[in-house]
From Swiss-Prot:
It comes from the Bacteria. Transmembrane segments: none annotated. InterPro entries: ATP_synth_F1_ATPase_gsu (IPR035968), ATP_synth_F1_gsu (IPR000131). This is ATP synthase gamma chain. CDD domains: F1-ATPase_gamma (cd12151). It is a peripheral membrane protein. GO terms for cellular component: plasma membrane; proton-transporting ATP synthase complex. It is found in: Cell inner membrane. Produces ATP from ADP in the presence of a proton gradient across the membrane. The gamma chain is believed to be important in regulating ATPase activity and the flow of protons through the CF(0) complex. Gene3D superfamilies: 3.40.1380.10, ATP synthase, gamma subunit, helix hairpin domain. Belongs to the ATPase gamma chain family.
Length: 283
């Protein structure tokens, strides 16, 4: 009976875990659809912004920042605030360490800025002297405006770095995401013809270009953030689906074991009852 009770309690525990993983899978799937919609909208906005900048930039390979007297490279590493998303964060950390080693082998000084505390927790002991800050609670970012407010509130001056890179998991499909590095600053914008002479600017041209360049950089980072969020939710959907399948398999084995144990207990009881009747009959 003790064995039956232990099996029953274990089955109850597995059923509870199964419900939890199923709910988490459904929530992540819903969040993934929302992020995909936001990502598509951000890409469309970025396309139109790129057209405007291409029309108004002065020359080819225009650099939006002054690179003099700047030595450090800023690497923005995007991960998640939570686990239970498969190897999503492990891929980011492994790729980040490899990329940092590559930059340092070229004699460059790298500073780190983290979006999401999981990668930070995995790397803080090794790169403590390089870390500027870590931003957690990133799930509170719901649109471009909240992303800008979140970024402005950080107090990080991106203009103090010679290069700014963002490292994130790029979303391709639900089952395919790859760690990627993209350059944010300086923003090199290539065009074939300068059309500045065909337009009048109010305020001054450089002010307009500076504002558009800042918007361009923020949009690049926002798209990287959304790509990373989509990859996170996709990884969590797959991880929870796998966990749910594992609980189903475990539960079926436990049910089979429970039924066998119960049948054995019933058989034992019947044998004892029959043996008792037989002993009484013999008397």
């Amino acid at each position: 009976m003790a064995n039956l009770k232990a099996l029953f309690l274990r089955m109850k525990s597995v059923k509870s875990i199964q419900k939890t993983t199923k709910v988490m899978q459904m929530i992540s799937a819903a969040k993934l659809r929302q992020v995909q919609q936001r990502l598509n909208n951000a890409r469309m906005h970025m396309l139109e912004l790129s057209k405007i900048i291409d029309t108004n930039v002065v020359s080819k390979n225009n650099e939006c920042t002054d690179r003099h007297n700047k030595k450090d490279i800023l690497l923005v590493i995007m991960s998640s605030d939570r686990g239970l998303c498969g190897n999503f964060n492990n891929m980011i950390v492994k790729f980040a360490k490899s990329y940092i080693e590559e930059l340092e082998s070229c004699g460059k000084n790298v500073k780190l800025l983290f979006f999401g505390k999981v990668a930070y927790n995995m790397m803080c002991s090794q790169y403590s002297s390089k870390i500027l800050d870590v931003f957690s609670n990133i799930q509170s970012i719901t649109d471009f405006l909240s992303f800008k407010l979140f970024l402005y509130g950080s107090g990080v001056d991106f203009n103090q770095f010679i290069d700014v890179m963002v490292l994130f998991n790029k979303f391709y499909t639900t089952i395919l995401q790859k760690p990627t590095v993209e350059q944010l600053m300086p923003c090199n914008i290539d065009i074939s013809v300068s059309l500045k002479e065909y337009y009048k600017y109010e305020p001054a041209y450089l002010n307009v270009l500076s504002t558009m360049s800042l918007s361009y950089i923020l949009n690049l980072m926002y798209i990287a953030f959304l790509e990373n969020c989509a990859s996170e939710h996709s990884s969590r959907v797959i991880a929870m689906e796998s966990a749910n399948n594992n609980t189903k398999e475990m539960l079926s084995k436990l049910v089979l074991q429970y039924n066998r144990s119960r049948q054995a207990a019933i058989t034992t009881d019947l044998i004892e009852v029959i043996s008792g009747f037989e002993s009484l009959g013999n008397q």
